[in-house]
Amino acid sequence: MKKKNIQTPVLSMAIAACMISHQQNARAGEKPSLQNDSVPYVTMPDVSPKLTTGDGNPLLDFMFTADPTAVEYNGRIYVYATNDQQQYDSIGGYGKNSYEYIKSLVMMSSDDMTNWTYHGIIKTDSIAPWIQTSWAPSIAKREEADGKTHFYLYFSNSGGGTAVLTSTSPIGPWSSPLNHSLVDTNTPGIAGECKAAFDPGVVIDDKGKGWLTVGGGCARIMRLGKDMISVDGPIKPIRAPHHFEANELNYINGTYVYTYNIDWQDFSDWPLQTEKPTTCCMSYMTSKTPLVTKSWKYQHNYMKNPGDYGFDYSNNHTHLHKFRGKWYVFYHTMSLQHSFNTTAGFRNVCVDEIQVDENTVNIHMGNQTLKGVKQIQPMNPFIIQQAETTAATQGVKFTNGKSIGDMYAVTVPNKTGIIAVRGVEFNKVPSSLEIKASGNGIIEVRRDTPDGEVIASIKVGTPQMKLIESQLQKNMTGTMDLCFVLKGNNITFDEWKFK
């Protein structure tokens, strides 16, 4: 039987209430919090759970992430997540993931749902020094009078409040328009009954109005001001049965859809005629008039706990998103931590398809898998592709490039680095490969697997980042996977393109 990693509502609220003392301990030197944008090498899996299996989950196999949200922009889906890796880097695999050292958010994106580009982290504590921690983001975008698309990224400022960052790009730079939380546990309409004002969920409806939900152990909804960084009018309750956390909002066919995490109780007091939900599952409610409390109708649960799908039992958090005509559910499990030889509660973001009937606003029961979703378009090898775009990795970490959201792949000492990409379509025969890299060693390109047929072998011998071109050892066409195998010392890999 799987060991359950269960936090009761009382324990969850206690953790939130203790965040201030945790932060004071950290500042006093009990545990340093890493503040750079790279993924430091602490312990990495000897074998990636994705490299040889063909699995698509988790989205990133080299770091821990959780509590996903997403937004579409220019044909790509951008996913934002809690940076569990920062907690892991601060305490190691033998501590407990109690989230107190997490002061950043993770960014990644994809145009094919298989190869994911890691854009680095948002250092929330540098942008907004007044925050305590940053968890569970939710994002919305809109085009404004200046002709630019503006992004509004809300996140939990510990358990006590919800903060917001803004940008005119999905990868930043980000700024804090306020010097305090947008709402907290002292805000009228939240104060008193709600012990936590966190886990925000945001949506913009078809009239251009923004809406925000928050809460832990209770749920609150508010209309946002025209500036998206203020509250317009009263904050109203949503009477969500057995509410725990993980609020999100969608707007489907003129209906407001509120999703949340059901608690760990036995439901002997379940107040509705509907089927009782499963423990710590995800459920949803609907309304046409969101500020009218009685208008909210509970529907049913649409995703069980990860433990009910064969993973470890854990807290639960999802985001529903329609992309390229398909509905997806983003969620987290704790499957990756076993590759890191830890059971301390570190999470990883995954995605699977889910069926949503938009006419009836019915969300069918979803599934959680290691396999994940199908690739929705092939990768084009004849345009510049970034080394931080991966389907699977092993023995590499990522550090900042020269521009915001640009990363370099760097080999880990005493390990062969591997970067795999999938579904690469050669619709013509290439003659050469150009890479940008530095260091000393060899970058091999192999077909399908890390020990597959060698397509190209490029010698790297330069301390400065440099374009290097090489003829191919093998002619090929068709669709295939590629593995970039990095052998040598201090290889830094930026980009590649076939010609």
Where are these regions (language model features)?
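Bacterial Sec-dependent N-terminal signal peptides
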Residues: M1-E30
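Carbohydrate-active catalytic/glycan-binding domains of CAZyme proteins
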Residues: G29-S457, G461-K499
